[in-house]
Amino acid sequence: MQMKQTPKSRRVYCAAACMAVAVAAFPAGSQGYPPSQRGTVTQNVAFTAISVTYGRPVARGRELFGALVPWDSVWHPCADSATRVTFNHDVLLEGKPLRAGEYTLWLIPREHAPWTVIVSRAAHVFHKPYPGERFEVLRLDVTPEQVSPVESFAIYFPMVLRDEAVMRLHWGTTAVPIRIKAPFKPEPR
């Protein structure tokens, strides 16, 4: 016994066939996971909350600094959207004052000299192109460290004391430590 097709059943069949073709037409990679995962780290230092949101590129066997990331050029330490760091109170970064707010971080890696960390007030930008000096709030010279390798870029706080901490930007065998002092104290009641 054969079922009679109605105009409605033909439309449903045609729509289902079109959906199947459309799904099959996309390459598997475009339906998969993003190549760089998003990460977030938060840390309280004394009475100051610090939050960092960033993309985590993966080394995938590539030579990183001096190759993938050229020397002496502004580089965004992350993937996709620029790394955002938020402080709810004023802090000192490497001894230099920074007002509470939301910022992005940029680096200038150097082969034989301290690296430059750039703090920019351009808070909601993509990682390319660099938004420019007109948005810069601070430039810090920091000496990178040679450390155990990590495959995925990571930002973390390996040291947290009473009112100070070290935030480390780490990829491959290189880590850039940034000293943070959080002097804010609430008024006694």
Feature roles, as predicted:
Residues 2-6, 28-99, 104-189:
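Targeting-peptide/extracellular-domain and disordered-appendage signature
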